[in-house]
Regions:
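A glycine/threonine-rich phosphate-anchoring loop and its flanking beta-alpha core
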Residues: 114-160
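Glycine/serine-rich anion-binding loops at beta->alpha junctions
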Residues: 98-117
């Protein structure tokens, strides 16, 4: 179960990207066992359903600089919604030396990666994927895409 064990690094590997190499770490267990500094200095973007299900377990992250709770559906993964997310982060004093921490599946990963690649001309991000597809697609592949108008996944980035 996601929130029951410690969070050891069980394996890692390097990816060679056209934007430069980066390391992928695989971890299992309790995401709240991440180092406290990372949790409390990050602006967290989390899937609403995940937060609803594990509300008690996620209490420690409620004191992060900002917590942006998003319902993981296609309408929220759109260019029209980006100003809402950017305004939230700016209002909560996002700085270039801080990072975005995404907790959720592919939609949350896409939103967070797209924001991280574009806000303040690019900031650091960290993913905690909760689905296998999100792990392989947006996390290891470091790609994100959002919808614009009637076009699905038309705007995107590769952000190692």
């Amino acid at each position: 179960m996601l929130l029951t064990e410690d969070l050891p690094v069980s394996n890692c590997f390097d990816v060679q990207s056209h934007k430069g190499p980066y390391r992928v770490h695989f971890m299992t267990g309790n995401i709240l066992a991440m180092d406290e500094e990372t949790l409390l200095s990050s602006h967290i973007i989390i899937d609403k359903k995940l937060l609803d299900i594990y509300e008690q377990q996620f209490k420690p992250i409620l004191s992060a600089p900002s917590l942006l709770v998003i319902e993981a559906d296609e309408k929220n993964k759109s260019l029209d919604k980006m100003p809402v997310y950017v305004n939230h982060l700016v209002k909560n004093k996002l700085r270039r030396n801080q990072k975005l921490l995404a907790i959720g599946g592919g939609i949350i990963q896409d939103i967070t990666c797209f924001l991280a690649a574009n806000i303040l001309r690019g900031i650091e991000w960290q993913f905690v994927p909760t689905t296998l597809l999100a792990q392989a697609d947006s996390c290891i592949g470091s790609k994100s895409s959002i919808n614009c108008g009637d076009s699905k996944n038309i705007l995107g980035t590769f952000t190692p």
